[in-house]
A protein has these predicted regions:
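Conserved ABC ATPase signature
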Residues: 38-48
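Helical segment within the ABC ATPase nucleotide-binding domain
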Residues: 78-90
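Helix N-cap at the start of a conserved alpha-helix in ABC-type nucleotide-binding domains
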Residues: 74-76
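Short coil-to-helix segment of the ABC ATPase nucleotide-binding domain corresponding to the Q-loop/switch region
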Residues: 1-6
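Conserved ABC ATPase "signature" region
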Residues: 9, 16-33
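Conserved signature/switch motifs of ABC ATPase nucleotide-binding domains
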Residues: 37-40, 58, 90
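Catalytic Walker B motif of ABC-type/P-loop ATPase nucleotide-binding domains
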Residues: 63-66
Length: 140
């Protein structure tokens, strides 16, 4: 919980209020029961959700998600991408940086950058596809 509440500490919020908000955000991400666990007791997906809660707690206008599924198993990757999609549906701007085409293909727009130069910008009409292909099956 302290990890999620940390940005509010730097904003000068009192401990009681920041802990209450941290617990609320952990609950939204399905981690309320894990609020007092240490990071070494959590899975990669749980840690990623903690990071998302920490990013959201200050109610930013934009989230920069750098390789949000990089160290996750396939099931947890789908869950994390669904969280990001839900946030986007709620009006938040999400910028996903990834090397994985399956992750990029879930976004509304794909901007390809090579050597620091924008190569192409594409509207992604298939952005509702699963991370593992249009039909949701595992890629072969």
């Amino acid at each position: 919980m302290e990890n999620v509440a940390l940005p509010l500490f730097y904003q000068g919020m009192n401990r009681r209020k920041r802990n209450a908000l941290a617990l609320e955000y952990l609950d939204r991400l399905g981690l309320k029961d894990w609020a007092h666990h240490m990071p070494n007791e959590m899975s990669g997906g749980q840690k990623q959700r903690v990071a998302i809660a920490r990013a959201l707690i200050t109610q930013p206008q934009i989230i920069l998600a750098d390789e949000p599924t990089g160290a996750l198993d396939s099931k947890t990757s789908v869950e994390v991408m669904q969280i990001l999609k839900d946030l986007h549906k709620d009006g938040m701007t999400i910028v996903v940086v990834t090397h994985e085409s399956g992750v990029a293909n879930q976004t509304d727009k794909i901007i390809r950058i090579k050597d620091g130069i924008i190569g192409s910008i594409e509207e992604n009409l298939n952005h509702n596809a699963s991370i593992f292909g249009v039909n949701g099956g595992a890629m072969k």
